[in-house]
Amino acid sequence: MVSKKQNIYLINWLNFSLVVIILMVIIGAITRLTQSGLSISDWRPVMGIFPPLNESQWNEAFDYYKEFPEFKKLNFNMTLNDYKTIYFWEYLHRILGRFIGLLFIFPFVYFLSRKFLNSSLIKSLLLLFSLGVLQGFMGWYMVKSGLVNNPYISHFRLAAHLSIAFIIIAYVYWIKMSIMYPDKNKKSLQKYNHSINFILFLFFIQIVYGAFTAGLKIGNYWNTFPLMEGQFIPYGLWDLEPAYSNLLNNKKMIQFIHRAIGIFLLISIYLFSFKLKDLSLDFNLKGRNLVTAISCQVFLGIVTLISKAPLVLAASHQFLAVIILLLLMNTKHSLKYKR
């Protein structure tokens, strides 16, 4: 039997882990927005913890970077000082990833040895660890896609990398909440669960299309709202063959879908908040928080689009998406477990 004090240690560990993972996601956004993601062209899980420490090592790293298409085709005028700037963000992103790995492994082993963990929690944490390992490999797999003749990362791999990050955040939060509130609700709230599951499904589709928009740099085009090229539904959405490829590669279609899902999410959450009013004051507050967050996100998305995705706005847009996910997971957990 795990004591309350032991649970507090577990909750604090998961809370801290959650903060660091969210920080990792924001730094990942900055790394992408500053075009820093291909600055480190190899993957050394152990020796990669050491950055260049003197001028000779910096020149060696820069010379290695010069061998790849990003320098040859895009950054041929880059100086060593410019390179140090983009190296910093990618290095910080990678070193934080390693820190998260250690932040999981050492406390997990300690808690396991002290019998803080029941069998169900052990399984959940091992699954979480597997997701973390998968995310590490996906990050490198994504970088590799930009080290070839076309010096741009695959928007499909970026979408996978970002989606896994959001899944990890949701899962860490769910595990933490399940430790805090382990008793299931007896009251049937199935109709509310269906609604929140639908919203979560829409949310993750939106994350994918947000990654497509970012990976293909579509934020630089059609910088008006609500119209695109003077129309609500612009021409050219189905120009590619076969038809399904428009959903994956047509820049105009991808931005249109990202806009449309954003509005659809706003409406869905607004309607869902009315349902929650019937339950309790607590659920009413959760509904209002969701409406406020999604309203701010839609507004921020529009401003980011109109201003052609400047770094601060675009990174804030990604951060607010994390907040919305946490609010959704909190509401979903509250529908299933007693408070």
Name the predicted role of every residue range.
Residues 16, 20-27, 123-143, 198-206, ...:
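Small-polar-interrupted transmembrane alpha-helices in polytopic inner-membrane proteins
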Residues 64-102, 245-265:
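Individual transmembrane alpha-helix segments
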Residues 112-126, 273-290:
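Membrane-interface helix-loop-helix junctions at transmembrane boundaries of multi-pass membrane enzymes
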